[in-house]
């Protein structure tokens, strides 16, 4: 990973100009795909331009908006937001119960200054990993699978999940705020919509995840 824990060559952060700034979940993160076959590496090769990949597995729309807020610099030309319809709204429903993330939605001046706190973030992550390693030998296989699927780290304080009846309106607000933020930064926002296979294979057209 790079200096901030994302899947990039570290020197990408030192480029005078960032042509592509990617946010998303596991598709962008590069889960199960090694460099140079992940999306950002392929884009970097085909375009011969600088690409920053800020995707992380498990991220939802609110975390992705918070990522833009925390890491977007003036030298970024294009922000590419990759949305996966299979579970991103479900992730947003969970994220809407996290006070620390809701602050980004309700307070345009809120920041955790994450770029300046990487040493602190690293320590938190190391402590959590060491703590979980001690527990692993006591976990049954099903518990281990659940742990791996649920485990998400980004140095943020997590609160209990609660359902949000307004998560679809939150999604609209997130997109509007993201557009305004990128315009203010003189960057251009591109929203890439990844459809779910089951929507067409199984005819799940009325699933709420597919009807925003």
Where in the sequence are the language-model features?
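Membrane/wall-proximal cationic-aromatic binding patches
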Residues: 1-46, 154
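N-terminal secretory targeting modules
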Residues: 1-19, 74-75, 88-93, 97-98, ...
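Short, flexible loop segments at the rims of nucleotide/cofactor-binding pockets, characterized by
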Residues: 1-3, 55-59, 167-168
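A structural signal for isolated positions on well-ordered beta-strands in alpha/beta enzyme cores
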Residues: 21, 52, 80, 190-192
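Structural preference for long, well-ordered alpha-helical segments in enzyme cores
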Residues: 23, 67, 175-178
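Conserved SGNH/GDSL esterase-like catalytic core that processes O-acyl groups on lipids
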Residues: 29-107
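Serine-dependent acyl-ester chemistry module
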Residues: 84-212
């Amino acid at each position: 990973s790079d200096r901030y824990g994302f899947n990039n060559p570290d020197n990408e952060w030192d480029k005078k100009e960032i042509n592509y700034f990617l946010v998303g979940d596991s598709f962008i993160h590069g889960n199960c795909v090694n460099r140079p076959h992940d999306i950002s590496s392929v884009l970097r090769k085909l375009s011969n331009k600088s690409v920053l990949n800020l995707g992380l597995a498990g991220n939802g729309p609110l975390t992705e908006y918070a990522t833009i807020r925390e890491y977007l610099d003036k030298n970024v030309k294009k922000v590419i937001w990759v949305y996966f319809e299979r579970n991103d709204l479900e992730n947003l429903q969970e994220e809407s119960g996290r006070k620390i993330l809701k602050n980004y939605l309700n307070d345009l001046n809120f920041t955790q200054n994450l770029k300046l706190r990487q040493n602190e973030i690293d320590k938190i992550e190391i402590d959590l990993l060491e703590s979980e390693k001690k527990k692993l030998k006591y976990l049954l296989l099903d518990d281990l699978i659940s742990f791996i699927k649920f485990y998400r780290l980004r140095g943020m304080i997590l609160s209990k999940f609660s359902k949000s009846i307004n998560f679809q309106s939150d999604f609209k607000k997130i997109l509007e705020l993201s557009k305004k933020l990128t315009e203010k930064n003189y960057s251009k926002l591109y929203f890439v919509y990844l459809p779910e296979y089951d929507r067409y294979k199984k005819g799940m057209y009325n699933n709420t995840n597919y009807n925003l």
